[in-house]
Amino acid sequence: MTKVSGIGGIFFRAEDPATLGRWYEDVLGVDVLERIWIQTEGPTVLAPFPKDTDYFDRPEQQWMINFRVTDLDAMIAKLRERGISVTTNPDWNSEAGRFARIHDPEGNPIELWEPAQRQA
């Protein structure tokens, strides 16, 4: 059976797409706008949540992007140096790895995920 091989893009509305795109490039290092972002290999999770979840922070929020990082502590330090508020909660961490949360300048929640090291 043929199946999907990965996520080809993430598209969302923004009040000021150019400015928000630059924020994602400058703060998170994600190539956006006119370029293609070649990701490093790693797991991707697609997980529908119940309609009444509070996991996305805002009731009207229909989605939340989760970016994989290799060193969550270093990323948190970098973001805080830039004055970006970072939320962590030990209850979010699991056998899947460690998590933190930020918001982009338009209030969209962004989850940062350091996957757990796989045992050989």
Explain the meaning of each model-derived region.
Residues M1-G6, F12, I76-A120:
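Vicinal oxygen chelate
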Residues V4-I7, P43, P59-Q62, A96-G97:
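A structure-centric signal for secondary-structure junctions around beta-strands
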